[in-house]
Every structure is written in C-alpha cells, then in structure tokens.
Amino acid sequence: MVQNRSLHHTYFIPVVLYVLLILDGFLINAFPGQFVSEEYILVPHLALFGFVLFSYYFPKQPMQLYAILFGLLFDSYYSGILGVYAVAFAVIVYFVKKMQRFLAENVFVLALLFIVAIVMVDSFVFGFYSLMDITQLDFSAFASERLGPTIVLNIVLFIVIYYPLFKLVGWMYD
C-alpha cells in the first residue's frame, strides 16, 4: 500500500485543503445560475473530497484536527452556524480512516467513499437545519432537489480533480 513508503511534504495537506475550501465558494459565486435554480441546488464538495482523499492515503496524519479547524472555517464563511461542518468533517475523517483498512486502494473505492461522504454530510446538515427550523424542505424534496444533483455535480468534479490530486499524493510520498 502507498502508506508504507516514507512521507514527505505533509505541509501541503492544509494548503491543498484551504485551496479546495476556497474553490468550493468560488464555483458557486462564479457560476451562480448554474448551481442554484428553482428546480435544484448543486453544492460542490471539493474540501470534503480533500478530507476523504487525504484521510484515505495519509491515515497517520492529524486529519481530525484539520477537519475541525477547516470545518470551523467553512462554517464561519459558508454556513454561519459554527460547528455543523466541523463535526461533519471530523466524522467523515473518522469514518474514512476506519473503512480504509478494509478497502482496496483504487479510484473506484475512493469515488464510492466520496459519494457516501457527501450523503452523510449533506444528510447530517439537513437534519440539523431541520431540527433548528432553518430549512423548510422535507426529506423527499431535499433528496431530489439538492442531494441527487449535488452527487452528480461532485462525480463530475471528482473526474476532473482526481488525477491532479492523486499525482500530488504520489509526490508527497517521494
């Protein structure tokens, strides 16, 4: 497995996570009509992909700490309620680290983990917002108008960014 080689350049992990976090907001602001309409809401989850990728390939790195810190940053910039995404990202990192030892190391497994992470995070946030009466959507509307389109968008984004980030992971081990 990749993690048996020596790891260098770990300082790039928070830098890449920060760039992915900024890209999440950039995509929504640069193309607002494409991501939000009356029929659907598309939410890019590039930062979440970063957490899945780095937790999968670098299980000994302090990803829980990064998840909490970047989750708080994400909350302060995007959601306005501190702690929601911090908890969600930390749970995803824990989940990926626990699942990683049972799974084969390939692109399809990583894609599946990413899709499961999207479902977990978006469902958690939806449930929290529903409990707090922040959203008026019912679960079927959430699933059809937000979760489904979000998964499709993020599969496309996964196809676009997987190879460059995988090469970065390889470089970090050299």
Q: Predicted regions span which residues?
A:
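Terminal, non-globular segments
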Residues: 1-174
